[in-house]
Amino acid sequence: MKWISVKDRLPENEVDVIICAQMRYYKGGTIPVVSTAFHTDGKMNTEESGYNWDLGNVDMEYDEEVDAYIVPEGWWESVRYGEEFSAVDDFVTHWMPLPQPPKGE
């Protein structure tokens, strides 16, 4: 698998991928960080989403037509053994699909 630049294309909504982000640190520089995350395009509403967006720290616009909130565009780091996720506040530069799990186990 190869890294894909976010300038070339983005993954589909809510598909878990591996990301590379430039994490800021206290001395003003950045370091590359690799993590799992998913992207949202800012067009999907909470009723279409597979996640529970009942987060007090995410500012969402309400859409009266569909009686749901619009999930903001962005990257969201996900935790695999829980229902938690949080915004990736650093600059994501690249992503790649997750590998397939091992076979025959």
Can you name each region flagged by the protein language model?
Residues 1-105:
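Secondary-structure transition motif
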